[in-house]
Swiss-Prot record:
This is ADP-L-glycero-D-manno-heptose-6-epimerase. GO terms for biological process: ADP-L-glycero-beta-D-manno-heptose biosynthetic process; carbohydrate metabolic process. It comes from Proteus mirabilis (strain HI4320). GO terms for molecular function: ADP-glyceromanno-heptose 6-epimerase activity; NADP binding. The keyword Hydrolase does not apply. The keyword Disulfide bond does not apply. It comes from the Bacteria. Substrate binds at residues 169, 180, 187, 201-204, 209, 274. Its EC number is 5.1.3.20. Homopentamer. Belongs to the NAD(P)-dependent epimerase/dehydratase family. HldD subfamily. Catalyzes the interconversion between ADP-D-glycero-beta-D-manno-heptose and ADP-L-glycero-beta-D-manno-heptose via an epimerization at carbon 6 of the heptose.
Length: 312
């Protein structure tokens, strides 16, 4: 059996899809379906069982036997960068992760987990997986950073695979439930379908991010699992592209000559807490042996637009 926590969420459900595509269906999805809209991420996927997150945590703490587990993909977390309830964030993203990590270590189960580029904070260069480059801007980033630090202490003695991925700006299918935390591509497409021009924040021409297609993220996870590689790795494309490039790709898909980008005021609450530039350093990822290319914004957004608008 393979366990995917956060399996009804964005990246988790895409990992389930990638596993399905390789013939794996003996999958336990763990999630919190209080937001019932997330069920749509699972309707076309094949899984063996579903378990509520709270019940799962209780079982892990109790040391319950789940039978033979081939891997745990731990994608379950609070991923809101605007959530400031630190206790909630640390319970969800730190304590839960530690419990599950030790459960896997005790049983030599490969453990792959979601870290984040938010660990790097507001820096504009050297996005490298080393302590001296890490200074998160929000409590979400801090919770991810702290777990990475915990893993670093454990790794030298670990007898089984432990691997974390610092996801950069992920976009693609199955993120519709994320609301304001969904990708720029998702929001721009919604605006166009609502008869509006796509909107970007003022100053967006100076913002560049490392946008990575979710299918590429899932492929990285499965490769590292198959190859039994441990460590903490950036998961981005190694390219910084502009928000304008995302808007251009959305406009190109809709092929409407009347569409143009509108600029809106930058929100006060995000000032000083916003990553204006991200670009994954892929040196360690490539050294580990991962050689596959990553989609450009133009390529990935075009694929995503086809998926989003397939029923239109």
């Amino acid at each position: 059996m393979i366990i995917v926590t956060g399996g009804a969420g964005f990246i988790g459900s895409n990992i389930v899809k990638a596993l399905n595509d390789e013939g794996y269906t003996d999958i336990l999805v763990v999630d919190n379906l209080k937001d019932g809209t997330k069920f749509v991420n699972l309707v076309d996927l094949n899984i063996a069982d579903y378990m509520d997150k709270e019940d799962f945590i209780a079982s892990i703490v109790a040391g319950d036997d789940f039978g033979d587990i081939d891997a745990v993909f731990h994608e379950g977390a609070c991923s809101s960068t605007t959530e400031w309830d630190g206790k909630y964030m640390m319970d969800n993203n730190y304590q839960y992760s530690k419990e599950l990590l030790h459960y896997c270590l005790d049983r030599q189960i490969p453990f792959l987990y979601a870290s984040s580029a938010a660990t790097y904070g507001g820096r504009t260069d050297h996005f490298i997986e080393e302590r001296k480059y890490e200074a998160p801007l929000n409590v979400y980033g801090y919770s991810k950073f702290l777990f990475d630090e915990y893993v670093r202490q454990i790794l030298p003695e670990a007898q089984s695979m432990v691997c974390g991925f610092r996801y950069f700006n992920v976009y693609g299918p199955r993120e519709g439930h994320k609301g304001s935390m969904a990708s720029v591509a998702f929001h721009l497409n919604t605006q166009v379908n609502d008869g509006q021009n796509p909107k970007l924040f003022e100053g967006s021409e100076t913002f560049q991010r490392d946008f990575i297609y979710v299918g590429d993220v899932a492929a990285v996870n499965l490769w590292f699992w198959r190859n039994n590689v441990s460590g903490i790795y950036n998961c981005g494309t190694g390219r910084a592209e502009s928000f304008q490039a995302v808007a251009d790709a959305v406009i190109a898909y809709h092929n409407d000559k009347d569409l143009s980008v509108e600029h809106i005021e930058f929100p006060e609450k995000l000032k000083g807490r916003y990553q204006a530039f991200t670009q994954a350093d892929l040196t360690n990822l490539r050294k580990a042996g991962y050689s596959a290319p990553f989609k450009t914004v133009a390529e990935g957004v075009a694929l995503y637009m086809q998926w989003l608008n397939q029923d239109k």
